[in-house]
Amino acid sequence: MLTNMQIAALMFLSFALSIIWAFIIIRKENLSLKPLLYIFLFSFFAVLISILMQTIVYFLSQDFLKTTGYAYGILFDCFIHSSLPEETVKALLFSIFVKLLWSDKMKNMDEITPAQNRANIRILMLLSVFYGLIFASFENLAYAIRYPEAIWLRTFTSNILHACLGVYYLEISMVQKTRKIIKPFLFTWGIHGLYNMFFSIGSYFVIFGIVIVFFVISNAVSRYDRFKSN
């Protein structure tokens, strides 16, 4: 069980990364605080809605969990109870942010220059990373209380994982055809589920969770480069 001082240090570390990233966005893009505050609120509400959805799934699955074995229980908890509601809510709320608060910059794609288009996408990418960092910061608090084992390592890797998955929320928010949403969403769901599973099992399996984080970093960078060039 973590002490109050340890929890406070954990939260400081988590939100420090978010604050540093916000400072980078402001300096690099000369952006006002307004979109960052909106992102903070959208991410905070994503946390609350995710918790609500996960609670509903948990109560609806009580009978199933009583009869299932350890392996199926881990899979259900990591992929259905935890990852699926969370990734659905995060992708949906970020899409709402883009549609409601950024559509005026993106709707007239034929009237803006390629340089302006790249600048808009770059800013949205930076904001999507900030979105993931804020979500991870709040989530780390919940995990610190419920699952204190390996929480320090999980805090660092979780922040990076959520930040990199932000690139996929950006892609989901900007595709025009519904079928093109499926692939990036399945990726975020599957990767997040695997990450949760390895950290839930613990021991040496945590190494596989760290490998997943490095894979997501590489994949997110290449994904952004392809997305930006389209």
Spans of model-derived segments:
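Hydrophobic alpha-helical segments at protein termini of multi-pass membrane proteins
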Residues: 1-230
